[in-house]
C-alpha cells in the first residue's frame, strides 16, 4: 500500500514512488521536434566536491521551480546537468587522501548525482557530462588550435606566484601571508611563458552588449562595465637616458589626465620592466629591491592595499613638453601586465603618487586650480595634505603653472596637448581598456592539456585536429610536488606535425574557466562531432541562467566572450549566451564557537548545539550538547567549512523529505536575498505539508466530488472560489514574472487557511473544495513535485506527469464580487465600514455611508461639503 492510499504522509515513500515514475517514463528528456516554444533554464554547473551543500540546494531548486512552471505553461523545457570536474580542489584532495584526482572526482560525481536525483530535480540526465572527460575537452582543444591559427591565442611571458619548494605555480588564494599554503616557503613572483586569449579584441563589443542584456541585474552589468574599464586618453612618449646619458628605449605611458602632464615630477615603472632590469645590472641595492618585490602575491587587490615602496633607478625620463629630466622610479604598485608597465607620476593631483612623493621627498607641483572654491580648504593648495579636489576633473578648474596651457579647462587642455603630441610624434589619442587578455595557462596537472607541440625548428605548433584529443593520463601517482605530466618523459615526447622532428608537448593545462565558459552550449548538442551543431541554434540563447553574483566578473565575462568566439566560428547565430540572469543570495546560518587561549576559535556545528531563545525567538544563549557547557554565539554568516556552520542537506532530506527542504528554501527569502537557515522553519514547512496531505485525504475519503455548478453556488462557496482564483492569479504572476516564490507559497498558505475554515459538506461545497485542492496541488507542483504527484492521484486522477498538466488559470468570472466592503472615512479618518452591492449606484453608496452610525456621530454639527468615492475601496466624507 502506498503512502497516497493511507492517511499518513511518508515523504520517503512518496518521493521514491514519484522519482521511479519519472525515471521509467523518461519524463524530462527533451528534443528539438516539439511544436511548443523552447525554454532553456540553466543553473551554473556544480563542482563535484563530494556532497551537496545548502547553496547547491537553493541554486538548483530555484532553477527547478522555474523549469517545472515553464513546462506547465506550455514550453519545451531543457534543464540539463553536468560537472565542472577539473581544478585545484581535486589535487588538494588527492594529496590528502593519497589517491589520484580522477578517482576522487569520479567517486564524487557518482555520489552527488544520487543526491541531485533525491532532490527530485527535473533534469534531462541524457545530456550529462563531466568536463574532465576527453569527449568533452576535445572540443575546447580544437577551438584553441583554431584560435591559434586566427591569432586570437598567443604566448608571452607573464608573472605568476611561484613556490620554490614545491616547484609549482600557486593561485592567488594559495598564497597566505606571502607564503605557500602547503610548503610555507616565501612565494616568488616569476615570469614564465603562458598562453592567452585575446579577449581585448572583443572589449568594445562586450561593453556594448551589456546594453542589450535587459534581463541581467544592473549590479552585474555595472561590475562588468567597470572591469572592462573603457577610458579615453593619450599615450605619451617619454624619451629615456641612462645613468651615463646614453639614449635608451623610450617609455610610453597612457593617461586619461593629459591636462596634468605639466605636473609630472617622476615616472614609475614595474619591477619586471626591461628598464628596471637594465638599471639593476650595476646597482646591487636596486637588484635586491627587485628581488624582494618578486616575493608575495600578484593580484591587483594586494597591490592596492600594500605599503607603497619604490626606488630611483638612476635613469632619467625627458619631459615631452619642458625637456626637463625627471627620475624613473621602480614602484611596487605598478603592474607589468597592465598597460605598458609604466605610469607618469603627478603627485600634485594623484593620491597614490602623492603618497610616494611625500614618503620619499619627491617634488610636488600644482597644475590645477579650482574656479569655484567652496571653502578655505579649496582656496589653498598644500601638496603635503591631500584633498580630493586635487584629482576631481568634474569640478570647474583651470590649468596653472602650465606655461602656454594656463587657463585651459580639462577639455581644452586635452585637445591642445593631443594636437601638440600628435604633431611632434610624441603621442596619440588612444582608447584604453582595463580589461586584460585572458591568461589560460595553468601549471597544474588536473586540467585539460593545452594542445600545443614545441619544436626547436618550428616553434609552437598546434596539435593537428585529427590527433585530438590530447588525453590527460588519469592513472597517476600524485604528490603535489610538480605535475605528473611534466615529469613523464614518455607523455611529453612526440613528433612535430610540421617537420616530423623530435618535439615535446605543452605540459601546462587550461584554466578551468575554459570548461565552464562553453558548457551551456554543449548541453544543446550531445554527441555532436563539433562543440555545437544546428541544435544549438534551437536552444540558444539560454532563457534563464542562475548563479551567484560572485561570478559577475570572471565566469560571466568569459561566458559572454566564448559565446562570441562560437558565433564567429559560425557554430551559433546569437550574440549573447543568456537572455536573463538571476543571482541568488547566500545561505547563512548561526555560528557557535569556543575561544582558545591563543586567540583562535574552535567552531562548533549548529547540530551539536542546544539553543536557548526568548519569547520572540531570539537566541539568548547556547550550550554544547556533548558537555552541557556554554558556547559563544558568533552571529549569522555564510555557511562554510571554515565556520563549521553548514547544514547537511542529506540529513535534512532523510529527516523531513526533499519536498520540505525545497519548500523551506523557496519560502524563507526572495531568491536574490540571503536565506537564513532555521530548522524551526523547516519543521513548519513539514507541518504545512502534513496539513495539506490530511486535508486531501479527508476530502477524498468522502468519495468523488460532484461537478461544479457555478450558477448554484451560495455566498460562502463563491467566496472560497474567489479566493482560489485570486490565489491562482497571484501565484502565476509570482512564478512567471516576479520569481517571487516566497510570496507564492504564502498565498497558497492563505488559501489553505481559508479551506480549513470552510465547513460546507454539501454537493457544491465539496465541488468548490475539490477545485481549491486541485489548484493547490498544481500550484505547489513546481516546488513540491513529489507530494503533488501523489496527491493528484488521491484527488481522483490517474498517475501522470503533472508538468504536462496546464498551469491553473484564474477564472475572471470567479473574481467578481456580489458585495463589497467599503471603508467609510470622515475627513480622511476611518470611522466605519459598509456592505454594498457590487453594482450599487453612487447615490445608494453615499446614503449608506452617511447613515453609518459611527461616521454619523463624527459628522454631528458639521455640513457635508463633498463625498469622494474610490471605487471598491473607500468612501471619504468631507465635512466642515
Swiss-Prot record:
It is an enzyme of class 6 (ligase). One of its GO terms (biological process) is leucyl-tRNA aminoacylation. Keywords: Aminoacyl-tRNA synthetase, ATP-binding, Cytoplasm, Ligase, Nucleotide-binding, Protein biosynthesis. One of its GO terms (cellular component) is cytosol. ATP binds at residue 641. One of its GO terms (molecular function) is aminoacyl-tRNA deacylase activity. A motif ('KMSKS' region) lies at residues 638-642. Pfam families: Anticodon_1, tRNA-synt_1, tRNA-synt_1_2, tRNA-synt_1g. It catalyses: tRNA(Leu) + L-leucine + ATP = L-leucyl-tRNA(Leu) + AMP + diphosphate. A motif ('HIGH' region) lies at residues 46-56. Its EC number is 6.1.1.4. It is found in: Cytoplasm. NCBIfam families: leuS_bact. Belongs to the class-I aminoacyl-tRNA synthetase family. This is Leucine--tRNA ligase. It comes from Stenotrophomonas maltophilia (strain K279a).
Amino acid at each position: 500500500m502506498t503512502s497516497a492510499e493511507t492517511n499518513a504522509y511518508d515523504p520517503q515513500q512518496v518521493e521514491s514512488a514519484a522519482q521511479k515514475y519519472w525515471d521509467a517514463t523518461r519524463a524530462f528528456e527533451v528534443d528539438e521536434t516539439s511544436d511548443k516554444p523552447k525554454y532553456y533554464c540553466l543553473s551554473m554547473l556544480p563542482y563535484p566536491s563530494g556532497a551537496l551543500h545548502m547553496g547547491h540546494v537553493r541554486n538548483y531548486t530555484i532553477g527547478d521551480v522555474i523549469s517545472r512552471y515553464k513546462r506547465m505553461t506550455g514550453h519545451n523545457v531543457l534543464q540539463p546537468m553536468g560537472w565542472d570536474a577539473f581544478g585545484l580542489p581535486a589535487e588538494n584532495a588527492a594529496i590528502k587522501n593519497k589517491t589520484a584526482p580522477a578517482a576522487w572526482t569520479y567517486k564524487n560525481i557518482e555520489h552527488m548525482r544520487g543526491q541531485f536525483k533525491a532532490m527530485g530535480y527535473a533534469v534531462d540526465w541524457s545530456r550529462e557530462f563531466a568536463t574532465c572527460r576527453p569527449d568533452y575537452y576535445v572540443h575546447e582543444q580544437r577551438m584553441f588550435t583554431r584560435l591559434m591559427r586566427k591569432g586570437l591565442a598567443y604566448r608571452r611571458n607573464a608573472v605568476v606566484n611561484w613556490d620554490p619548494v614545491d616547484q609549482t605555480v600557486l593561485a592567488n588564494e594559495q598564497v597566505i601571508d606571502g607564503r605557500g599554503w602547503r610548503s610555507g616557503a616565501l612565494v616568488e613572483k616569476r615570469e614564465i611563458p603562458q598562453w592567452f586569449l585575446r579577449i581585448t579584441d572583443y572589449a568594445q563589443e562586450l561593453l556594448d552588449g551589456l546594453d542589450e542584456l535587459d534581463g541581467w541585474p544592473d549590479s552585474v552589468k555595472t561590475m562588468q562595465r567597470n572591469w572592462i574599464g573603457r577610458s579615453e586618453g593619450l599615450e605619451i612618449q617619454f624619451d629615456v637616458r641612462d645613468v651615463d646619458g646614453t639614449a635608451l628605449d623610450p617609455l610610453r605611458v597612457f593617461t586619461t589626465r593629459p591636462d596634468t602632464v605639466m605636473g609630472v615630477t617622476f615616472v614609475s615603472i614595474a619591477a619586471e620592466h626591461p628598464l628596471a632590469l637594465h638599471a639593476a645590472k650595476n646597482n646591487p641595492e636596486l637588484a635586491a629591491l627587485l628581488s624582494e618585490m618578486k616575493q608575495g602575491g600578484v593580484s591587483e587587490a594586494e597591490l592596492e592595499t600594500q605599503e607603497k615602496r619604490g626606488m630611483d633607478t638612476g635613469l632619467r625620463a625627458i619631459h615631452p613638453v619642458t625637456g626637463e629630466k625627471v627620475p624613473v622610479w621602480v614602484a611596487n604598485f605598478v603592474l607589468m601586465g597592465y598597460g605598458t608597465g609604466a605610469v607618469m607620476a603627478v603627485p600634485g593631483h594623484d593620491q597614490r603618487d602623492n603618497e610616494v612623493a611625500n614618503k620619499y621627498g619627491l617634488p610636488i607641483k600644482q597644475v590645477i586650480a579650482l574656479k569655484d572654491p567652496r571653502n578655505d580648504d579649496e582656496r589653498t593648495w598644500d601638496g603635503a595634505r591631500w584633498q580630493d579636489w586635487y584629482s576631481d576633473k568634474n569640478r570647474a578648474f583651470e590649468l596653472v603653472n602650465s606655461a602656454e596651457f594656463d587657463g585651459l579647462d580639462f577639455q581644452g587642455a586635452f585637445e591642445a596637448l593631443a594636437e601638440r603630441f600628435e604633431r611632434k610624434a610624441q603621442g596619440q589619442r588612444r582608447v584604453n581598456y582595463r580589461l586584460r587578455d585572458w591568461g589560460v595557462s595553468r601549471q597544474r596537472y588536473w586540467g585539460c592539456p593545452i594542445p600545443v607541440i614545441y619544436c626547436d625548428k618550428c616553434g609552437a605548433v598546434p596539435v593537428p585536429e585529427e590527433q585530438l584529443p590530447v588525453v590527460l593520463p588519469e592513472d597517476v601517482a600524485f604528490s603535489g610536488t610538480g605535475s605528473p605530466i611534466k615529469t613523464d618523459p614518455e607523455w611529453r615526447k612526440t613528433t612535430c606535425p610540421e617537420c616530423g622532428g623530435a618535439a615535446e608537448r605543452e605540459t601546462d593545462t587550461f584554466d578551468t574557466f575554459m570548461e565552464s565558459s562553453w558548457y551551456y552550449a554543449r548541453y544543446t548538442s550531445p554527441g555532436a562531432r563539433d562543440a555545437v551543431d544546428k541544435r544549438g541554434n534551437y536552444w540558444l540563447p539560454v532563457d534563464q541562467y542562475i548563479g551567484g553574483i560572485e561570478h559577475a566578473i570572471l565566469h560571466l565575462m568569459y561566458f559572454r566572450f566564448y559565446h562570441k568566439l562560437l558565433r564567429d566560428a559560425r557554430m551559433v547565430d546569437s550574440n549573447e549566451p543568456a537572455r536573463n540572469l538571476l543571482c541568488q543570495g547566500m545561505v547563512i546560518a548561526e555560528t557557535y564557537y569556543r575561544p582558545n587561549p591563543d586567540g583562535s576559535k574552535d567552531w562548533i556545528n549548529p547540530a551539536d548545539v542546544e539553543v536557548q531563545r526568548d519569547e520572540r525567538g531570539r537566541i539568548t544563549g547556547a550550550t554544547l550538547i556533548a558537555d552541557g557547557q556554554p558556547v559563544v554565539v558568533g552571529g549569522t554568516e555564510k555557511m562554510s567549512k571554515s565556520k563549521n556552520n553548514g547544514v547537511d542537506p542529506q540529513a535534512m532530506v532523510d529527516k523531513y523529505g526533499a519536498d520540505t527542504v525545497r519548500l523551506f528554501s523557496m519560502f524563507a527569502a526572495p531568491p536574490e536575498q540571503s536565506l537564513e537557515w532555521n530548522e524551526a522553519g523547516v519543521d513548519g514547512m513539514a507541518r504545512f505539508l502534513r496539513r495539506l496531505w490530511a486535508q486531501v485525504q479527508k476530502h477524498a475519503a468522502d468519495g468523488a466530488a460532484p461537478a461544479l455548478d457555478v450558477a448554484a453556488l451560495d455566498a460562502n462557496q463563491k467566496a472560497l472560489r474567489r479566493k482560489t482564483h485570486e490565489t491562482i492569479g497571484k501565484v502565476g504572476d509570482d512564478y512567471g514574472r516576479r520569481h517571487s516564490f516566497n510570496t507564492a507559497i504564502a498565498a497558497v498558505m492563505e488559501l489553505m487557511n481559508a479551506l480549513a475554515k470552510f465547513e460546507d459538506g454539501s454537493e457544491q461545497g465539496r465541488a468548490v473544495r475539490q477545485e481549491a485542492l486541485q489548484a493547490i496541488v498544481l500550484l505547489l507542483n513546481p516546488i513540491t513535485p513529489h507530494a503533488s504527484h501523489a496527491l493528484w492521484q488521491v484527488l481522483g486522477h490517474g498517475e501522470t506527469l503533472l508538468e504536462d498538466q496546464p498551469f491553473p488559470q484564474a477564472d475572471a468570472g470567479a473574481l467578481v464580487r456580489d458585495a463589497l466592503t467599503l471603508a467609510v472615512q470622515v475627513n480622511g479618518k476611518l470611522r466605519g465600514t459598509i456592505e454594498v452591492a457590487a453594482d450599487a449606484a453612487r447615490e445608494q453608496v453615499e446614503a449608506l455611508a452617511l447613515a453609518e452610525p459611527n461616521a454619523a456621530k463624527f459628522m454631528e454639527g458639521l455640513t457635508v461639503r463633498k463625498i469622494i468615492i474610490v471605487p471598491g475601496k473607500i468612501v471619504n466624507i468631507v465635512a466642515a
